[in-house]
Structure formats: structure tokens, C-alpha cells
Amino acid sequence: NFIFGILLAWILTRYQFPMKRFVDGLIELPFALPTAVAGISLTTLYSDKGWIGSIFSKWDIKISYTKTGITIAMIFIGIPFVVRSIQPVLEKLDLQYEEAAEVMGASRFCIFRRIVLPEILPAALAGFGLAFARSIGEYGSVVFIAGNIPYETQITPLIIMNKLEQFNYSAATSIALVMLIFAFIILFSINLLQSLISRIANG
């Protein structure tokens, strides 16, 4: 989400191309779709007989019911948070600094690393934190494409649901508590890093 979000925000902000507004609007799709609909749609698209999955199946690459499918679902539901966090920062960024650096002989990579990245990094981390918070407890959009294969594609929310259905409340509570602690540590670390980077950037 972090890398794809930065790349997509950069393309939407810095380049003009046909149907740009349509593509920009598609970013909001995960917010509008019910999670179950998103999960069923992704599973259909990436199954061996789906539009996208059938292409990969020719090379014996399976996407649905694998960890790759879970990753794709996580990216789908999380990338809008990263893109929408970065876009306003890129739009407000003064292009004169980049143009001046280019005139002085700096490479595009150097310009991005020294000028653009320090500006967008706090926003990117904030977006990543939101995407992570959404993904860690996601159920509907992931459960279908995951397939719930034991020890391979079982997702934590589904394990909790299974434990509850078995009336094993202590196990469900323990797993949920571990998830809660893990999420808190990750989000706290992201916020701490974001604060540190902002402080360094502001001198």
C-alpha cells in the first residue's frame, strides 16, 4: 500500500492522461462497495476462470485462495487511504524547488529523494497507518478470496469467528487481545515515526 499509494498519487497529481477523472474516482470504490461485494468481485476476477486469473493460470500461477490473493485484497481496501493522504500534499508542493534542482543538474531520483519524499513522508505514513488499521480487522473483502485453507490462507478475524461458533470464547478472546496489542504497537510506532519525521522536517 505504501509504495503503490505513493506511485498512484504521484501519477494522478503530476500527469495528465485520458480518463484521469474516472481513474481518480475509482480510488473511492473500496469506500463505496460493501466489503462482501468487494470480496466476491475480487475472487471472481482472480479465479482460474476469471478475467485476470485466467491469464495467470496459463503460467500455472494461482491467485485466488492463496496468500497473493489476500495481499491483493488488502491493497485494494487500503490503497485509497494512502493515495488520499498524499494527494493534497503533492498538489500544494511548490514545483519551483524541483525545477531549480533540475537546472542545477540533480537527477529525477535525487529530486524525489531530497525534495519530494521528505514532504510527503508524514502523510504517507498517516495513510499507511489508516490502511493498516482497516486491513488488520478486515473480514468481508478478504474471507472469500482467502478460501480459509487451514495453516495457509486462514485470516485472523475468521479464526476468531470459528472459535466463537465453537463456543470457545477464551480462545477467541485471547486471539483478539493479541491482535489488539499488535495493532496498538504498530500504530503507535507509525505515529511516533510520523511525529519524529515532521519534527526533523520543520527543523
Where are these regions (language model features)?
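Transmembrane alpha-helices
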Residues: L29, F76-G78, V82-L90, D94, ...
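Membrane-helix interface segments
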Residues: Y15-V23, W51-I52, T66, Q96, ...
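Generic alpha-helical transmembrane segments of integral inner-membrane proteins
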Residues: F2-L7, L33, A124, F128, ...
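Transmembrane alpha-helices and adjacent helix-loop boundaries
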Residues: A32-G39
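C-terminal transmembrane helix and the adjacent membrane-cytosol boundary/short C-terminal tail
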Residues: M19, P80, Q87-E102, I111, ...
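Transmembrane-helix boundary motif in ABC transporter permease subunits
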Residues: N1-I27, I40, T44, S54, ...
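Membrane-interfacial helix termini and adjacent extracytoplasmic/periplasmic loops
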Residues: M19-K20, G39-I75, F109, I145-I149
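Interhelical loop and adjacent transmembrane-helix boundary motif
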Residues: Y139-S189
